[in-house]
């Protein structure tokens, strides 16, 4: 057993405990409180004066798929030979030795979603990862988790340059509808061919409500197109990026469609990102839209996830909402809130110890725990 004592603990479950104790047994949090008795056999970590948060969750990255320094060799994020590739699995392209996994831990990020890029209308299946494990195979936590799709500039730019569809937003929407309509027609067939089953299996899961469509979209008009498609096929959808989501907030709230918001700590790289701003987080919160922050690593280095939260507070977001948007909210969006996202008894022991307040840029991550295993030096 491990006992971490003396820290200010942000449980993200409705309270802050000053000078508290966290007891960890194996992979799980056994207890947390202000006045817990520490068992004699426990290995004690003195965290007096420190701050503890649940491990951060980045719900949208390309970690291991798009490496920072290996260019062609480390770029496996977009399969640009076909705009419809739902059969692809991000896990098959990940380099688990990517330096970014250590960067994630340095930033307090203990779990992350890795997904294909946005060149394709249907890009493939996402995988949810731990950033630390005893082996690369054990870093895979949920696979698959969601089917990546895209509307907007990227598919029409990539395939328009190849002189094939989609060259317009109309064609992008049409191809997405066609893929789902074809799959729906095949779903209950008894004599479906093996190749058709393999190619459409992920779409079947979305149609059956077994996993969501993770739809890359920035502009308000593209968001409305996405919502029309959601309504037509009755599927669960989560928006990725959602730069102009605040403009259509009522429509999102009506359908309970959440937004993986970001990357915000970046320039206006494309026309459809002209409204990118940290104030967008506060606007979504005011209008009741569920959202979490994402880095879209390597667009923003994954270790800067909490910097995004801090800058959103500067632009009007409440501190509690900002911290939730990198912990408990992504856990709920990923349907893993029974396991992750808060420091409560029974949850997995994902913790990060900070030298100061987590939203203070000067604070450093001193130690990280993932599933009960430590990464980093002993707290000084």
Task: Name each region found by the language model.
Residues 68-69, 75-81, 85-88, 212, ...:
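His/Asp/Glu-enriched, well-ordered alpha-helical/loop segment
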Residues 67-94, 135, 150-158, 207, ...:
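Active-site gating loops and adjacent loop-to-helix segments of metal-dependent hydrolytic enzymes
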Residues 50-116, 120:
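Metal-associated gating/positioning segment near the N- to mid-region
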Residues 230-237, 253-260, 288-290:
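Glycine-enriched alpha-helix->loop->beta-strand junction motifs that scaffold or abut catalytic
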Residues 7-10, 18, 332, 344-380:
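C-terminal cap of metal-dependent C-N hydrolases
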Residues 2, 9, 13-53:
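Histidine-rich, glycine-flanked metal-binding segment
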Residues 100, 105-237:
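Polyanionic/metal-chelating signatures
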Residues 7, 22, 27, 49, ...:
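Divalent metal-coordination and catalytic microenvironments
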